[in-house]
Design a protein with these regions (language model features):
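Long, low-complexity intrinsically disordered regions
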Residues: 1-233
Length: 233
């Protein structure tokens, strides 16, 4: 029986041990998840019903929901929609390899060399100049009231590893809002590995059973996934 993760320190150690983890599991994706690490081998509900009939997070879900934000806030792991747009946790030891696949320079303004939409560039520049911002703060900073468009730009910038989660900020009402920072500023990436070496590193961490699963997990095209999978055999 696997001992469940019970503290933020253990959650950080879990991410360091596996290299890349999803926050929640996905069918057909061989990566471990923080949820599974917290729940352990038991069948655990995400939501519980209280005596008054209202529903709330289970203790396990409370931990996952808090730690997914506390880990990046304390820089114990990189967090964001960095893999296929899924909420992902990346060990800081693995981050240089994942970042190397973007082709970006490891400096805070490295995104200026890549192709971005006008809104993506505006969002990235605002975060670069003003520091970590939430979506509402970003909308105010760039003068765009379209929540869906700004959130879409944030999602795409995370997938491109331009922006990353930096924690949360309390709002006047409702849930705390996630904040975002420039990834290459928030974390010291050092000297990036060669792209081919980085691709092999990421494939080893994923440890997919076959090339199609590797392609599905990474978003690489089928030919590239087959080539890398073959190189690992």
């Amino acid at each position: 029986m696997t001992r469940p993760v019970r503290s933020l320190r253990e959650a950080a150690s879990f991410v360091d041990r596996v290299g890349i983890a999803l926050v929640f599991p996905r069918d057909g994706i061989p990566l471990p998840s923080l949820w599974e690490a917290v729940a352990g081998d038991q069948q655990v509900e995400w939501v519980i019903e209280k005596e008054d009939g209202t529903k709330d997070f289970s203790p396990e879900m409370e931990r996952v929901w808090s730690w997914k934000d506390e880990l990046p806030a304390q820089k114990r792991a990189c967090a964001g929609k960095h893999l296929r747009g899924w909420a992902t946790l990346v060990s800081l030891k693995v981050l240089p390899s994942l970042y190397a696949l973007t082709g970006l320079h490891a400096r805070e303004d490295g995104f200026r060399q890549t192709e971005l939409s006008s809104l993506e560039r505006e969002v990235a520049e605002a975060v670069l100049v003003l520091g970590p911002l939430s979506s509402p703060e970003l909308r105010q900073a760039i003068g765009c009231e379209d929540t869906a468009r700004v959130n879409r730009a944030l999602d795409l910038l995370q997938r491109k590893l331009v922006l990353t989660k930096a924690g949360t900020v309390t709002q006047g009402q409702g849930w705390p809002a996630g904040t975002y920072d420039v990834l290459a500023r928030r974390y010291k990436l050092g000297r990036l590995p060669d792209e081919e070496v980085a691709r092999l590193d990421i494939a080893r961490i994923i440890n997919a059973p076959d090339a199609p699963t590797l392609a599905r997990t990474t978003g690489w095209n089928k030919r590239e996934a087959a080539r890398i999978f073959g190189a690992l055999a």
